[in-house]
Structure formats: C-alpha cells, structure tokens
Amino acid sequence: MSDAPLCAEGLECIRGDRLLFSGLNLTLSPGQLLQVEGANGAGKTSLLRVLAGLSRPAEGEVRWRGLDIQHHRASYFTEMVYMGHAPGLKAELSPLENLRVSVALRGRMADEARIDDALARVGLRGFEDVPARGLSAGQKQRTALCRLLLDPVPLWILDEPFTALDVRGIALVRELLEFHLANGGMALMTSHHALDVRGDCRSLNLS
C-alpha cells in the first residue's frame, strides 16, 4: 500500500454505455500537483468527481490516509476542497454573503476580517455587496477562489480553475497553487492552459 495520502487503484468509470477509463492508478503526496489532461469527453471531470468522492467509480477505490473515501466521506470532506466548472454562487447573494454561507457549510466560524482580506486578495474590494447576478463571469470565479484562502485544507481538486479569468486572475491562481504546494499542500486539476507552476508538477493524460 502506498504511503501517499491520496491513492487511487484500479479506477474504472463508465458514462452511459461508454467506457471512459479503466485500470487507472494514481497517488498524490504533499507538495505535488497532478494535472489531468485529455481531449473533450475523455473523462477528466468524471475522474475529478470520483477523486472528490462526489461520484462512485464502476470499479476500484480511492483512499485518503489509507481509508476508502466512500466509507469515510465526512472526514475526507473536512480535508478537501472541490471547485467544479461552475462557481457555485447563489445569484441573489453578494460575494461576502456567499462566502459566509460557504464557510458555515464547512462547519467553520465565519471570520469577517479573513473574508474581507480574501476578497481584497482576489481583486474584489468594492464588489463585496454586489449580488452575484450582477458580477462578471471572471468576478464570480474570483469569488469562488476565495474559498481556497478561507478553508486551509491539504487537498485541492480544481476543475478548470482558470475559467473566465483574465491575465491577472490566471497569475493569481498560479500564485495560490505555488504557495499551497510550497507549504505541503496537494492539488489535482484540469486546465486547457499551460500550467507554468513552480513545484513538483506532474500530468496524467486520459486520451
């Protein structure tokens, strides 16, 4: 058995009647980033959802610290953050309110100063109280990125985190990833952008 905190063995995923991948093995250790690559429809998002415990594989298992995540979901979810394609914001709530809800759903106390600092860090100072429906796609994505700053967990699973971001936003994501890895964090991600992140970065191609 691998000593890596995250270990997947013999994963098989089927969508409809189509086999996306089978016999897939991977590990992820502190300070490592794994970029999942492949053509559209290759199963990148499906793999990330399996690794995040949001979908079950047809075969195989995912273990976190030696325990099957499907049988220990609650403890796994306290150590992992998943960011999907959509920012996951409530349209009628402001960035500030959305982040308060996000922190509360994670079972943590909302620290107003930390939320304010996170919004400033991602360039949303002055937009704290604007309903999400009035934000641009890039501003919504920046709001979602605040969750990485507010929830200090070891594992990030990010599906296309650069979506809708401008050059500064992309640079910010890279900066966050580099800091996370340098401090012993781990990351799994998909992206159509060149990664260009300093650290122990690897790739897995599903095509």
Swiss-Prot record:
<keyword id="KW-0813">Transport</keyword>
<dbReference type="GO" id="GO:0005886">
    <property type="term" value="C:plasma membrane"/>
</dbReference>
<dbReference type="GO" id="GO:0005524">
    <property type="term" value="F:ATP binding"/>
</dbReference>
<dbReference type="InterPro" id="IPR003593">
    <property type="entry name" value="AAA+_ATPase"/>
</dbReference>
<dbReference type="Pfam" id="PF00005">
    <property type="entry name" value="ABC_tran"/>
</dbReference>
<keyword id="KW-0067">ATP-binding</keyword>
<comment type="function">
    <text>Part of the ABC transporter complex CcmAB involved in the biogenesis of c-type cytochromes; once thought to export heme, this seems not to be the case, but its exact role is uncertain. Responsible for energy coupling to the transport system.</text>
</comment>
<dbReference type="GO" id="GO:0017004">
    <property type="term" value="P:cytochrome complex assembly"/>
</dbReference>
<keyword id="KW-0201">Cytochrome c-type biogenesis</keyword>
<feature type="domain" description="ABC transporter">
    <location>
        <begin position="6"/>
        <end position="207"/>
    </location>
</feature>
<feature type="binding site">
    <location>
        <begin position="38"/>
        <end position="45"/>
    </location>
    <ligand>
        <name>ATP</name>
    </ligand>
</feature>
<dbReference type="GO" id="GO:0015439">
    <property type="term" value="F:ABC-type heme transporter activity"/>
</dbReference>
<dbReference type="InterPro" id="IPR005895">
    <property type="entry name" value="ABC_transptr_haem_export_CcmA"/>
</dbReference>
<dbReference type="InterPro" id="IPR027417">
    <property type="entry name" value="P-loop_NTPase"/>
</dbReference>
<keyword id="KW-0997">Cell inner membrane</keyword>
<keyword id="KW-0547">Nucleotide-binding</keyword>
<keyword id="KW-0472">Membrane</keyword>
<comment type="similarity">
    <text>Belongs to the ABC transporter superfamily. CcmA exporter (TC 3.A.1.107) family.</text>
</comment>
<keyword id="KW-1278">Translocase</keyword>
<comment type="subunit">
    <text>The complex is composed of two ATP-binding proteins (CcmA) and two transmembrane proteins (CcmB).</text>
</comment>
<dbReference type="GO" id="GO:0016887">
    <property type="term" value="F:ATP hydrolysis activity"/>
</dbReference>
<keyword id="KW-1003">Cell membrane</keyword>
<protein>
    <recommendedName>
        <fullName>Cytochrome c biogenesis ATP-binding export protein CcmA</fullName>
        <ecNumber>7.6.2.5</ecNumber>
    </recommendedName>
</protein>
<dbReference type="InterPro" id="IPR003439">
    <property type="entry name" value="ABC_transporter-like_ATP-bd"/>
</dbReference>
